[in-house]
Amino acid sequence: MANPRNEAALAELKARFAETDTVVLTEYRGLTVAQTTELRKALGFDVQYSVAKNTLVKIAANEAGVEGLDDLLTGPTAVAFIKGEAVDTAKVLKKFGEENKAFVVKGGYMDGNALTAEQVNAIAELDNRETTLAKLAGAMKGSLAKAAGLFNAPASQVARLAVALQDKKDA
């Protein structure tokens, strides 16, 4: 019969995989409890960061349809289940890894695809959703202003021509 603690942990992992689209696997070997607590605080409420047995993570991931993580599940592994903005979380993980050399991002899973550590770090270089939308709005505003100017140009040219003709008649 299976260990009840493992069964409970497996059920919790399955639920987490089911409710998130993005997962990042990390190696925490060499981190102190204080450093891990600091990381959890930095990640915020949209991320559940927990240590789990590799075997249980493999089973839960496979049952949730998450493929491609098996090779990453070696050694001590902690899993970040991301409910919010993946870019912001990737930035926090990358910064934490730069400050704590013992911390390593192994890879992850996002939108149906397994990710390498390099891809997770590349995501950290992207702008978050809010910044991207602001840039898009700014670009659209500039383009709309140019378009309005182009549409108004022929009308203003006709008006100037009419004024010039009127001035010529009056002279």
Swiss-Prot record:
Any GO CC annotation of this UniProt entry: ribosome
RNA-binding recorded as keyword: yes
One annotated GO molecular function: large ribosomal subunit rRNA binding
Family under the similarity heading: Belongs to the universal ribosomal protein uL10 family.
HAMAP family in alphabetical order: Ribosomal_uL10
Assembly information from the UniProt record: Part of the ribosomal stalk of the 50S ribosomal subunit. The N-terminus interacts with L11 and the large rRNA to form the base of the stalk. The C-terminus forms an elongated spine to which L12 dimers bind in a sequential fashion forming a multimeric L10(L12)X complex.
The protein's name in its UniProt record: Large ribosomal subunit protein uL10
